A protein has these predicted regions:
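C-terminal interaction segment
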Residues: 1-28, 32-81
């Protein structure tokens, strides 16, 4: 199982299914999940310890202790508008 998972939310995704996936990921040993919301150009970070945070379009994502030294601007995850 990977340490980091990226989940991209589409307009048809159901919240309950996403929550179920998150539980499955963390049960399997995933440490960090980035749930990417293309419509709002934002990301929600979920951590295995239960912590989490919204990162908006002007924010930065880091690999934290999962990918030390890695960072990316949220805006770079999406095509230019």
């Amino acid at each position: 199982m990977p340490d980091l998972v990226f989940e991209v939310i589409s307009p048809n995704d159901e919240t309950q299914k996403t929550e179920t996936k998150l539980q499955e990921y963390f049960t399997a040993g995933v440490r960090l999940v980035w749930v990417i919301y293309p419509e709002s150009r934002s990301v929600y970070i979920y951590r295995a310890d239960g912590g989490g945070a919204w990162v908006g379009p002007d924010g930065m994502l880091t690999g934290e202790d999962v990918l030390p030294g890695f960072s990316v601007a949220v805006k770079d995850l999406f095509p230019s508008s």
